[in-house]
Amino acid sequence: MAEEKKETMEEPKIGVYVCHCGVNIGGVVDVEAVRDYAAKLPNVVIAKDYKYYCSDPGQLEIQKDIKELGINRVVVAACSPRLHEPTFRRCVEEAGLNQFLFEFANIREHDSWVHMDNPEGATEKAKDLVRMAVAKARLLEPLEASKVSVDDKALVIGGGVAGIQAALDLADMGFKTYMVEKRPSISGRMGQLDKTFPTLDCSMCILAPKMVDVGKHDNIELITYAEVKEVDGYIGNFKVKIEKKPRYIDEELCTGCGSCVEVCPIEMPNYFDEGIGMTKAVYIPFPQAVPLCATIDKDYCIECMLCDEVCERGAVKHDQEPEEIEIEVGTIIVATGYDAYDPTEKLEYGYGRHTNVITGLELERMINASGPTDGKVLKPSDGEKPKRVAFIHCVGSRDEQIGKPYCSRVCCMYIMKNAQLIKDKMPDTEVTLYYMDIRAFGKGFEEFYKRSQEKYGIKFIRGRPAEVIENPDLTLTVRSEDTLLGKVTEYDYDMVVLGVGLVPPEGAETLRQTIGLSKSADGFLMEAHPKLRPVDTLTDGVYLAGVAQGPKDIPDAVAQASGAAARAAIPMVKGEVEIEPIIAVTDSDVCGGCEVCIELCPFGAISIEEGHANVNVALCKGCGTCVAACPSGAMDQQHFKTEQIMAQIEAALNEPASK
């Protein structure tokens, strides 16, 4: 246990510790010269250097000086605070010093790494950075973290394979978990697939048992055909409003017998079959649906009441209204999945105009035995089997012209999978793949790629097709450059399949703004750190899973979902979280209540109470936007107070180590 905190209102006694970081700093900067310079600065009682201060011996040396020399401020000149600031905060706290009486001078990323060709200049800059850190350290104040309690319930948004895995993991840990899915049944995109690559396992055979587990789990409350409309609060204490759309069927009474579907006279496009098949105005999405309950689409229903007449349980409720549900949870996992890219804007490929041009997901539903063609691959134009099929890779991916420069990571593999399945069903069919590069990066992927060539005889042409032309007989001519042969080719096909990429789902932007999340350049939700916090977000208590965070295959989505569940469980297990005190504070005597800070705060952490700004300590991230914008100077930021920053600036400008 840390020793009793030392009194810090006395005269500052500063210790400066300059790290070599092996040769990262020591190979460029004259560390000994920086150490000697620091020793002469006001209030510095000890200055030392060491090869690695982040190591145990280095930290023990700092702790020894705190205890024996009475040091009450510590400055470490080393690497990025992003990496080791928590390390040194713990170090000084274990020695009895408040952790916020520590200051970091970054002389690696800000100095040695960017001035490797100028050691002398780098050394002088290091002196400047250390002097600035010492100037701020003199004015540091002890701060104490606050704690907030955490509700031990969780919310999972999205009912695809990632959301299912996350919900089951949390529920198995004993936490009450709400799952919200916008469609009538959980399953996500995985439920639409026939087989999964590279093992060609039955997709629904893998997924359906997990779906059933979700529906039956005592700790999971499943809310389908619903969307999150409002999220207020902060980690441990989120208040969520959910709008549940009317099914016009009572979920508690419906047994999924299908009698209503049989008698319904109205047909409509089946969303689950990507619109290439038909269903009824009252429908059950697919046989394994969870919950197994019918839904009436009022856009098509003519209210003939035949469904009501045949329902023995009286489950049909034509007067059902939308329902607003309010829940309180401690943590949230966003697993909203993806949509397939709509290739209509790729006019050169003729999707939506050329009858026999379809997407990869539409082909998935054709191949599926429970799909609209009972597993037969048929040309949309005449219902006959195609003798020549072409696949075009990277439609909606790796294409800067349409603002989609990223790789969708699954297209190469799902195209080869479907090509193999076509050959299995129709061995005499000629299959050709037009590709830019084959990205077979996962376990078993390269072998899968080779099998496509060697066992199935699938033809590969390297090049992005320029145009797909529809001929009078509805065959299709694909004009493309073959970059390996260095010539333009034109081949005729009966059907062309577009390997469409993955894009953020409809409604993702609204949900992002509702929760207050960031997004990456490609539109997917952004993690807090790509390597160190890959499932966290910048909003504490909110985590990401699956393709919501970026394109990935099923194993990666499941692994990330389990990781997100584990991260979400940590604060709920503890029962409370510590809130760092580096936040904005308001001088109520100066604040005029102009609300400029409220408009600019990216985290919604400020409100007006009793005529002046009030900062919610749990929501504030200490970004300083309000401090910079406040016209009256009423806002300040702990640990980065105006006087502390000004002291650094004055130290940099008034006493430069070199001119």
From Swiss-Prot:
Binding site for [4Fe-4S] cluster 1: 254, 257, 260, 311
Pathway the protein takes part in: Cofactor metabolism; coenzyme M-coenzyme B heterodisulfide reduction; coenzyme B and coenzyme M from coenzyme M-coenzyme B heterodisulfide: step 1/1
Keywords noted in UniProt: 4Fe-4S, FAD, Flavoprotein, Iron, Iron-sulfur, Metal-binding, Methanogenesis, Oxidoreductase, Repeat
Annotated residues for binding of [4Fe-4S] cluster 4: 601, 620, 623, 626
Cofactor: [4Fe-4S] cluster; FAD
Role this protein plays: Part of a complex that catalyzes the reversible reduction of CoM-S-S-CoB to the thiol-coenzymes H-S-CoM (coenzyme M) and H-S-CoB (coenzyme B).
Name of the protein described by the UniProt record: H(2):CoB-CoM heterodisulfide,ferredoxin reductase subunit A
Organism: Methanothermobacter marburgensis (strain ATCC BAA-927 / DSM 2133 / JCM 14651 / NBRC 100331 / OCM 82 / Marburg)
The encoding gene: hdrA
